[in-house]
Amino acid sequence: MGKSLDKQFGRFLRQQRGQESYAVFAKRLGISASTLFRLENSDQSVTLGKLEDILKRLKARMRDVFPE
């Protein structure tokens, strides 16, 4: 993904995580806590397949992350 899309996705993940710990939230998403941290901070891009998997686990839609 492009940098601006990575940032939008990172903000979305932070918002969804709320006060939940990285470890607990990452487990729900099927990723490691370190991967979650990197995604939230736009230090790692996500593949389309992993994005779809994460959204499914959160019961969210693509337009929830990328409204425009």
Task: Locate each region found by the language model.
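A short, Lys/Arg-rich alpha-helix, primarily the initiator
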Residues: 1-18, 28
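Short alpha-helical DNA-recognition segment
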Residues: 18-38
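Residue-level signal for the short linker/turn that defines the boundary of a DNA-recognition helix
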Residues: 19-21, 46-49
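Phosphate-coordinating loops and pocket residues in cytosolic domains that bind phosphorylated ligands
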Residues: 38, 67-68
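Short, conserved catalytic or interaction motifs in soluble domains
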Residues: 41
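DNA major-groove recognition helix of helix-turn-helix/homeodomain DNA-binding modules
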Residues: 47-65
